[in-house]
Amino acid sequence: MASLKDMRVRIASTKATQKITKAMQMVAASKLRRAQLAAEAARPYAEKMDAVISNIAAASAGSPASSKLLAGTGRDQVHLLLVCTGERGLSGAFNSSIVRLARERALALMNQGKDVKFFCVGRKGYEQLRRQFEKQIIAHVDLRSVRQIGFVHAEDIAKQVIARFDAGEFDVCTLFYSRFKSVIAQIPTAQQIIPLVVEAPAANAAPVALYEYEPEEDEILSALLPRNVGVQIFRALLENNASFYGAQMSAMDNATRNAGEMIRKQTLVYNRTRQAQITKELIEIISGAEAV
């Protein structure tokens, strides 16, 4: 059995850990609000961008001049999985849940005879995926030095992806990220961004107004589609940022409460051991006195 001194050291160490997890929880909580507002503000813009492009695409359906970002390459053989994760850990299952979804998609595609490539954004996803798919990772973007995510960072990633698409390196690109729902709920999400999926209107949907476009639809799409890739990636990065702080806040809260419970149990064991030791010493003193 450990000595009383060892027990005191262990209790002090657990209390120090509890202070750290509590501080990290408070920091995550302070950053979460701003990250959540940014993610929620980006959603309507990204959704409206999709709606506008869908409307214009419907007007130019069948045009031979349609952009490949909309029409695709005509093939479905090579898939690029754009996996966005965090740069840091201590956030529960935030990173692993995104990687798990991407890994499941990759294995399913490979079982169908498809070729799979990875474009990793974030250190944690890259470290996990390279254990199994190292030769299939074609690019890795590290954002550890970025203090605040801006559209310029998403635009740079989008340019790299589009350049590889134009070079014929892949046929389909799917974006993986974590959609922020609440502090305790972050939803791993897969979204195809190349070629853009244009959803057909529902049968009972209200009629959509018809517009005349100037310049021509194809010219508008050629300008909007590359930007839309950047917008969707930017949205994913903002959703990830909010999800990370939400997951970290929840994880550190659990860690703080677990540390408190551990301190309670350790203190109980310490007090019992100390009481037993005192009782033993008293018995020895009494026995010695009686012997005299």
Curated annotation (Swiss-Prot):
It is a peripheral membrane protein. Its main location: membrane. PANTHER family: ATP SYNTHASE GAMMA CHAIN, ATP SYNTHASE SUBUNIT GAMMA, MITOCHONDRIAL. Belongs to the ATPase gamma chain family. This is ATP synthase gamma chain. Keywords: ATP synthesis, Cell inner membrane, Cell membrane, CF(1), Hydrogen ion transport, Ion transport, Membrane, Transport. Pfam families: ATP-synt. The gene is atpG. F-type ATPases have 2 components, CF(1) - the catalytic core - and CF(0) - the membrane proton channel. CF(1) has five subunits: alpha(3), beta(3), gamma(1), delta(1), epsilon(1). CF(0) has three main subunits: a, b and c. Produces ATP from ADP in the presence of a proton gradient across the membrane. The gamma chain is believed to be important in regulating ATPase activity and the flow of protons through the CF(0) complex. One of its GO terms (cellular component) is proton-transporting ATP synthase complex. InterPro entries: ATP_synth_F1_ATPase_gsu, ATP_synth_F1_gsu, ATP_synth_F1_gsu_CS. GO terms for biological process: proton motive force-driven plasma membrane ATP synthesis. It is found in: Cell inner membrane. The keyword Cell membrane applies. Disulfide bonds: none annotated.
